[in-house]
Amino acid sequence: MRWNALSHIALSAVLLAIPATTLAQQKVLKYAHFQPARPDQPKHAAALAFKEHVEKATGGTLQVQIYPAGQFGNDAVTMEGLRLGTLEMAVAHDGAIAVVYKPIGVLGIPFLYDSHEHAWRVYDSPWLKEFSDDMIKKTGIRLLGFADNGVRHFTNSKRPVRAPDDMKGLKIRVMPSPVFQTLVSSLGASPSAIVWAELPTALQQKVVDGQENGVTNILAASLYQYQKYITLDGHVWSVHGYVINERFYQGLTAIERKAVEEGTQKAMAIHRKMTSDQDKNAKEILGKVGMEVTVLSPAEIAAFRKLAQPPVKAWAEKEIGKEYVDSLFKAIEATQR
């Protein structure tokens, strides 16, 4: 009896020493993104803020494990993991999301917005919920929101580009997406689909003359080492979607779900500000790393828009669905000021 009593006392002491969160059912949220694990990188800074908020708000019942720099896998592996539930959450660019959800391709239609603020008004409007609901239905993945992947600009190693005619004869790397292939072709250049991981080598070895990306990605991958010229045309406002497996999301408690949603909003605010600050200071930032920067006037941008937007929009209506294009353009019109 004495030993039994002592055993109960010892067990009670052990249990009291264990934090309450370890006694509760602890969940793990694996969170993947594709930028280096550095605090000066928007996606990683956002991920750190998300982790801190979620773990604190849930009292540790929901733990966040960050997989930066593509550690979980490439675009296809990441999106398939989200679909199957082997990955809970990711911050993925629109080209990656298109692997499982083709309608996101409508966001690649060029020259849609007047400003960063206009784009955010669209992506924070009721249109987002309609889009997310459709994505859940078709893929089992929920879209929590969008942040910037940077306004996309053309770079090359051959010459300054100020007009569409200057694009002729250039071989331009694009994401493996028909939207971007159509865009580049419409301007008289030759598109070449190359995945992100292979892009620096392709530029270094002159497999292509140029590429198109946002300032954040140009800096993150040091693409300026191989590209002398950049034209700030801003042809596409590229996005990163904050996406989560729907089964996992529905399996969270109300407190955990609120923490994830609030954490996402905090992460997106950091992500948006860091990326837009780089975009707005692109001429100075890229000039300092040795690029020759061409800034276009509104009239010069209009010349690019006139050639590029109609064929890409027509392609999207035919291949993705007119209803998706119309819905987006309705939201764009409703949020103009």
Q: Which role does the model predict for each range below?
A:
Residues 11-12, 22-23:
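Cleavable N-terminal signal peptides
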Residues 1-10:
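Bacterial N-terminal signal peptides that target proteins for export
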Residues 25-119, 127, 134-337:
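N-terminal secretory/targeting leader peptides
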Residues 1, 24-25:
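Absolute protein N-terminus
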